[in-house]
């Protein structure tokens, strides 16, 4: 579930980040923070998913209507394969297929801590999960990204400035818990007033 270093752009992105100065990183962060948020992931709970192939680090729906059981996984596919794979349209949305019931289970963990299993996410990520001070927002993010971050923090593969604060939060989470949290947070979008102000 962690970041896959065999994926070509993982190592390229690591090298780019290592070569950046502090000023370049700050400038990049400010640029990306200034981009108006637009929803691009739609979470769909289901028992079956389209059969897919992997290309360029993406799951892409096969031609036809073949399906398979989802099992305990989230499958993210472009809403429009040609727009995403061929035209590289940055506004082409994704569908995140998740197991039935995962959003509700994730809400119990995120909103209430799952009866002591973890910490309420709003404590650090803000009441709408949009971030709080230097702590990033997690609402509306790719569920694959969220699951990878949780897993990497739990396994000790992340060493960022704030990672130590997350260690007790992720310590007791199972892979299914991480899947459920990822499904729930992906299903959340910023409030309408936050969208209009560009937050």
Predicted regions, residues:
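Short functional micro-motifs and their immediate structural scaffolds
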Residues: 129
């Amino acid at each position: 579930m962690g970041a896959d270093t065999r994926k070509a752009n993982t190592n390229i992105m690591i090298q780019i980040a290592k070569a950046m100065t502090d000023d370049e990183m700050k400038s990049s962060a400010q640029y990306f923070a200034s981009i108006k948020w637009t929803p691009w992931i739609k979470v769909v709970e289901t028992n079956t998913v389209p059969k897919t192939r992997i290309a360029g680090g993406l799951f892409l729906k096969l031609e036809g209507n073949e399906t398979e059981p989802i099992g305990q996984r989230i499958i993210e596919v472009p809403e429009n394969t040609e727009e995403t794979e061929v035209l590289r349209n940055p506004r082409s949305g994704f569908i995140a297929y998740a197991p039935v019931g995962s959003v509700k289970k994730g809400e119990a963990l995120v909103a209430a801590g799952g009866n002591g299993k973890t910490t309420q996410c709003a404590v650090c990520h803000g009441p709408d999960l949009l971030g709080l001070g230097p702590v990033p927002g997690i609402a509306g993010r790719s569920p694959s990204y969220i699951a990878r971050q949780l897993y990497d923090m739990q396994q000790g593969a992340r060493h960022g400035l704030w990672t130590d604060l997350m260690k007790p939060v992720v310590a007791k989470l199972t892979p299914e818990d991480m899947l459920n949290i990822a499904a729930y947070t992906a299903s959340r979008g910023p409030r309408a007033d936050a969208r209009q102000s560009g937050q």
